[in-house]
């Protein structure tokens, strides 16, 4: 059985907050420079080997004069959170297990540590991450089925498969907190010497913790903490609601058996920080995303900005003409 302690997940994909900020900032800066140099951020992806090609440089008289504005780091963050929630919605619609949803979201998060959303549209990458997660977790769904189920061209899924895998460095084994929750709840039954009544209450604790993990997956926590830490943070929050056991005593029991080098006070601090990240989570609505989505569309296809301006001008002209006609009729 695979072991998290010796995994690439633990070795290569758990970061400090500053590391994440640096990576997102670098990707945003690169995309911004691409927009200035080429007049667009769109990269062409070879579907066979995942190699990239840039467009022809924009003429000197066009560079910097198109009026297309790059997304800010904060706008990129909102875009990522929005599509991470979309991953959950799609997986729920297909009735995929939590493990597939979690793996797809972690793939998505890892991908956008390498790239800006201005370089690869998250709607397309989202689908490829779900498809890749299904393959790795042996829940076989064809690209055609997935595309048809959400009314998207399945070829987009396949075209982005290699660039996603390469961006993940082919580290495809992901550890999610859901399995850790199951293990800890079983352990809590022994700790509480649970009878029939306690057993049902522990199952309620488990279900609430799973819902808490669903929220955690939309924060930075999966890139900052181990699955075990995430699971215990979710169970701690759930226990605050159900009040089934003395959680501090339970943690002491876990630490005494695992002979952990980490002081329990430090671990409790991590749990509190994870739950703080969840409390701070704000999921943008489609209305919130409208302006950001328009900016992204213009970055990927600057000609769309001209079309948008023409429509706005035409709409204003119609409104003005209607107002004039109304005055003539009065």
Swiss-Prot record:
Residues 297-330 are annotated as: Disordered. Induction: By submergence in the meristematic zone of internodes. One of its GO terms (biological process) is transcription initiation at RNA polymerase II promoter. Expressed in roots, nodes and internodes, and at lower levels in shoots and leaves. Expressed in the intercalary meristem of internodes and at lower levels in the elongation zone and differentiation zone. One of its GO terms (cellular component) is transcription factor TFIIK complex. Keywords: Cell cycle, Cell division, Cyclin. Residues 310-321 have a biased composition (Basic residues). The keyword Cell cycle applies. The keyword Cell wall biogenesis/degradation does not apply. One of its GO terms (molecular function) is cyclin-dependent protein serine/threonine kinase regulator activity. It holds the Pfam family Cyclin_N. Involved in cell cycle regulation. May be a regulatory subunit of CDKD-1/CAK-R2. Interacts specifically with CDKD-1/CAK-R2. Belongs to the cyclin family. Cyclin F subfamily. This is Cyclin-H1-1. It comes from Oryza sativa subsp. japonica (Rice). The lineage of its organism: Eukaryota, Viridiplantae, Streptophyta, Embryophyta, Tracheophyta. The gene is CYCH1-1.
